[in-house]
């Protein structure tokens, strides 16, 4: 595949993931399929919605109760999962501009700054735990937990790398919470 085609496919992959994430913002953390279907007019999703829109402004996260999990977010915005992908893309761009190699050690200050100053999304239990661990100087090899083991945060790396082992390593690194 030529480089131009590859870059177009990678951009498509990244932006499609963000659009899909934004389409889910309205029902994010709602687990009642009938409630979700009703909120979208008993049909497929046709437009972006704000958090809990058409659901009384709230969704019901298992174990956390009913609330607005993304206060300040608007229709077309991303959930915490989309925000992580944007954060990783920003950090990769910064590494590229400064001619640095991505490391978890270099990501943490960027993540901490965003987390402390402008996150704006739900903060899950393991993210809170990771933040606390970092504040206590727990070694990076020991921070985090298992809640984001299925999170896909590494989409932007495909623009930088092609080696499967390195991509897998990067993917594991960015699942640090």
Regions found by a protein language model. Give the residues of each.
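Structured, active/binding-site neighborhoods that engage oxygen-rich ligands
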Residues: 1-177
